Amino acid sequence: SKLKRIVLIVAVTCLIVMFITAFSGRLAANQLMTGYILMIHVGTAPVFIVCTVFLIVSWGYQCRLTENEWGELLNRIMLKPASHENSMLFLKLTFWFSMGLSVPVSLSMLASMFTIFGTHGQEVLFNIHQYTSLALVSSVVIHLYLLLRNQYK
């Protein structure tokens, strides 16, 4: 439906904005986010999470693995030949992988806002946030590629 597409576009836009604000300073000058860049990053995060929850609820049933896809997945894990004609397995797996990665991305930053973890714990949570964010962006890029490729077959 149109609402799902709009939410997907908003979620991807928020992810792009957060990626640019997070990694541009790090790549350009090896500095962390501060000031307005940090406020933009933090301001788009709740919108992204709300969109992610909506996408999980609205696309979750469509992206469940069917009996044939479970068989294909098991064959691929056991390195057996598997028929992949019209298979949606990788598209569904990247969807669930992306949705799963959104949890540690969100919770690691949320947990680091509390002082119960101490200084070292906050640094560890920040590193978890950085690396899971990078994995999330990579997974979403692969998912969008597979989605567009499947749509324009």
Predicted features by range, described:
Residues S1-K153:
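Membrane-embedded alpha-helical bundles that constitute the cytochrome b-like, heme-associated redox core
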